[in-house]
Amino acid sequence: MAAPELTLYSREMCSWCIDAKDFLSERGYRFTVVDVGRNREAYEEMKSLSSQTSVPVLAAGDELLVNFDTDQLEKFLNEHGIKP
């Protein structure tokens, strides 16, 4: 089974988002970053998917992780068997 596509909804100056991007990049994960601060349509998409108005939000296929730190991110990836 292929790994789910990872999409990170973030904002440019969000420290939690920067940490998540660094964490994923340093471990070799492939992911798409969507800046909801610059793209209103993407913000509405994130809000519709997650019922959240704050970032970060990580979408991995049908699974979502919201308002997280890197420890929670690592746990989420492991629990769902998502590898780089």
What would you call each of these model-derived segments?
Residues 1-30:
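Local sequence-structure signature of Cys/Sec-based thiol-disulfide redox active-site neighborhoods
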Residues 11, 51, 70:
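ATP/adenylate-binding site constellation spanning eukaryotic-like Ser/Thr protein kinases
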Residues 15, 41, 72:
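Short alpha-helical
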Residues 31-42:
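Thiol-based oxidoreductase modules, predominantly thioredoxin-like and allied folds used
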Residues 49-58:
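Structural micro-motif
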Residues 61-84:
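Non-catalytic, surface beta->alpha helical segment in thiol-disulfide oxidoreductase systems
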